[in-house]
């Protein structure tokens, strides 16, 4: 049964694919080329079928069905061979959107079917992506993207993924933005997943994929996952949202579409939406439980790819936004629950005029013998198959806490960038205060909503129980209507039950009105009304932030200009510092030379003095030598003089002794004195002769 169903799906999806390619066959590739959501879903459907077929005994049949599908009257396999031509000058032949889609899908499909070794897959994809880069370089089609299916990704090692990433990261002229982001995501995801216990796992058939961060729709499409696949998450991840469908297009300059999403409360889901082939199917995972610094895909314009190419942004261009507030939360799809009753002859309440809530719902039943049963009011509360559908506008009230936290985070960041003394400090503090008050008010309203919803569930169960009892009593009444007393008792019991049921309905109606007051803002002062005001206030803050961003960009441009000037000034300052250093070195060398010169000059003066002293010493030496010669020459006279001096001294001593003793006569004394005088005369003559001889020798020497 499964194989038959798969073959039927593959046949339909192959036909849809061929039709889509044929429609795009003549759309020339350019910088504005991009794939619509419908085209991306068609590609995903056929690749999913081929992936599923790998686990069956018909694994090649889906691919054969695809190959035999026709484009412009020619089988796809023949068209593919023509445009591929063994890879020779492929960029010249693959010049339209249709040819691009056919080329990429057929390459992936053939690789899924025929290759199982990672090295073989890597070799094929390396050649393939170099051809893709050549195509993107030739036509500048940066928004074109058909990523690798999960069936091939799970067979590749991280080294292979990094090498494939380098093919795009090194080809700067290729303009393959989305391919670069795709492999960057796989790289980041691998290393974050290996170091964390947090994960969100998506699986179908034989393939599965896990990630701890938000996963954009174009990556889910490339991996061929859908919202109907099995989803499992770790218990620590609380704020996880799965986007499932595009509700409508806005076609404005700010946002392209509004989407439906499901909040993942449980740890495991067997799909959160029904498996359909709708053109508006979407699948993306928003993870608000992980640190925003490691999750680069949280921004809505990056998570949900706009249909209009001009609205698409790269990571560096994306600005903070609150566009998630426009999206609608829906309950998770459960295939075990009955579907809401639609298109079963029930007239729309507003079709008959009057207030939508006050109009009774009419339902046409097949005619029978009872004229009262021909047309009667339809009450959903009496229908056991009725499942109420609650439509919530924007993020559920409990999730506004996330928006508030994010706003506070941005305000803190803005405060840090503006500085403590900035002109917006007062406005930032006021905004934080209002957010704090709004947070407290939302907590109170949330508590009240939970209480009312709990009471509503209790009342609903009681109404169902009473309805069941009334039905049983009616059956009893129809079977025992014989006018007996028991019939009267039953009728009385029925009336009492009806009255009790009416009271319960009134109470339920009041509860529903109260819930409407809080959810839909039907009266002034309701929580939804306040949320609408809060949303308007957030939009104003969004506009203010955008204005501040524009101002900041202008300031950053001025700062960039100043930085360039400062950089030039720094360059000149560096050169000036070098010149100053050189001058200082020269001044130091000059000072050293001057010191050395002064030292040399001082040494020269000292040398001159020494030379003078030396000359004086030499003169004295010569004089001493002369005197020595004189002394040597007059040594005999000197000895004679010394003898005379000795004799005179002796005589003087005798004379003195004689005088002191009073001995001798005057004659002897006179004689001695005369002798002394004679000796002194001789001594003087000797001195005179010595002096004369010395002068004579000097004159002769001269």
From Swiss-Prot:
Residues 342-380 are annotated as: Disordered. Keywords: Coiled coil, Virion. GO terms for biological process: viral process. Residues 347-360 have a biased composition (Basic and acidic residues). Residues 420-522, 548-692 form a coiled coil. It is found in: Virion. The keyword Nuclease does not apply. Its main location: virion. One of its GO terms (cellular component) is virion component. Structural protein that forms a matrix surrounding the mature virion (MV) through interaction with protein A26. Presence of protein A25 in the virion structurally prevents direct virus-cell fusion mechanism. Interacts (via N-terminus) with protein A26. Some orthopoxviruses such as cowpox, ectromelia, and raccoonpox viruses, form large cytoplasmic inclusions within which mature virions are embedded by a process called occlusion. In those viruses, A26 bridges mature virion with inclusion bodies through interactions with proteins A25 and A27 on the mature virion membrane. In variola virus, the protein A25 is deleted in its C-terminal region and no inclusion body is observed. Belongs to the poxviridae A25 protein family. This is A-type inclusion protein A25 homolog.
């Amino acid at each position: 049964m499964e194989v038959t169903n798969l073959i039927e799906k593959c046949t339909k999806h192959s036909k849809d694919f061929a039709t889509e390619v044929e429609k795009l066959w003549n759309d020339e590739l350019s910088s504005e080329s991009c794939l619509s959501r419908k085209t991306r879903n068609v590609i995903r459907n056929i690749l999913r079928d081929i992936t599923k077929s790998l686990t069956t005994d018909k694994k090649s049949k889906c691919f054969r069905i695809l190959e035999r599908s026709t484009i412009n009257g020619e089988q796809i396999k023949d068209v593919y061979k023509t445009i591929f031509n063994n890879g020779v000058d492929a960029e010249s032949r693959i010049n339209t959107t249709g040819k691009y889609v056919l080329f990429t899908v057929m390459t992936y499909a053939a690789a899924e079917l025929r290759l199982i070794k990672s090295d073989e897959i890597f070799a094929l994809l390396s050649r393939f992506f170099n051809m893709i880069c050549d195509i993107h370089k030739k036509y500048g089609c940066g928004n074109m993207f058909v990523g690798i299916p999960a069936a091939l990704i799970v067979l590749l090692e991280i080294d292979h993924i990094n090498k494939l990433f380098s093919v795009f990261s090194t080809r700067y002229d290729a303009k393959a933005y989305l391919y670069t982001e795709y492999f960057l995501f796989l790289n980041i995801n691998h290393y974050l997943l290996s170091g964390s216990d947090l994960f969100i796992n998506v699986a179908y058939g034989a393939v599965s994929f896990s990630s701890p961060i938000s996963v954009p729709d174009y990556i889910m499409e490339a991996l061929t996952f859908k919202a109907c696949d099995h989803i499992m998450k770790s218990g620590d991840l609380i704020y996880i949202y799965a986007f499932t469908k595009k509700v409508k297009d806005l076609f404005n300059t700010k946002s392209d579409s509004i989407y439906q999403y499901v909040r993942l409360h449980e740890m495991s889901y067997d799909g959160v939406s029904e498996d359909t082939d709708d053109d508006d199917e979407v699948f993306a995972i928003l993870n608000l439980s992980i640190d925003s610094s490691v999750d680069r895909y949280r921004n809505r314009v990056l998570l949900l790819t706009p249909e209009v190419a001009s609205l698409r942004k790269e990571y560096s261009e994306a600005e903070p936004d609150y566009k998630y507030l426009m999206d609608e939360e829906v309950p998770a799809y459960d295939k075990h629950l009955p579907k809401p009753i639609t298109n079963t002859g029930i007239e729309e309440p507003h079709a008959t005029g009057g207030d939508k809530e006050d109009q009774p719902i009419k339902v046409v039943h097949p005619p029978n013998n009872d004229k009262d049963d021909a047309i009667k009011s339809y009450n959903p509360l009496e229908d056991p198959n009725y499942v109420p559908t609650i439509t919530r506008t924007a993020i559920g009230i409990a999730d506004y806490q996330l928006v508030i936290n994010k706003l506070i985070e941005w305000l803190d960041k803005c405060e840090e960038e503006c500085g403590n003394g900035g002109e917006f400090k007062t406005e930032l503090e006021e905004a934080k205060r209002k957010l704090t008050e709004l947070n407290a008010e939302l907590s109170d309203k949330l508590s009240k909503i939970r209480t009312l919803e709990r009471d509503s569930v209790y009342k609903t169960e009681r109404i169902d129980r009473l309805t069941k009892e009334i039905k049983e009593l009616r059956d009893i009444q129809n079977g025992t209507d014989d006018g007996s007393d028991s019939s009267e008792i039953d009728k009385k019991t029925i009336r009492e039950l009806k009255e009790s049921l009416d009271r319960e309905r009134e109470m339920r109606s009041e509860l529903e009105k109260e819930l409407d007051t809080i959810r839909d803002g039907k009266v002034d002062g309701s929580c939804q009304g306040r949320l609408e005001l809060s949303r308007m206030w957030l939009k104003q803050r969004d506009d203010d932030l955008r204005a501040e961003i524009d101002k900041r960009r202008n300031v950053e441009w001025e700062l960039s200009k100043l930085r360039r000037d400062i950089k030039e000034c720094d360059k000149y300052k560096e050169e000036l510092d070098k010149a100053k250093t050189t001058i200082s070195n020269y001044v130091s060398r000059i000072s050293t030379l001057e010191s050395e010169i002064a030292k040399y000059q001082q040494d020269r003066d000292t040398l001159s003095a020494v030379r003078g002293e030396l000359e004086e010493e030499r003169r004295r030496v010569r004089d001493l030598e002369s005197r020595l010669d004189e002394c040597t020459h007059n040594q005999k006279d000197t000895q004679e003089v010394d003898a005379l001096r000795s004799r005179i001294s002796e005589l003087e001593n005798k004379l003195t002794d004689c005088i002191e003793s009073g001995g001798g006569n005057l004659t002897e004394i006179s004689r001695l004195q005369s002798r002394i005088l004679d000796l002194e005369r001789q001594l003087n003559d000797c001195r005179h002769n010595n002096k004369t001889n010395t002068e004579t020798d000097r004159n002769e020497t001269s």
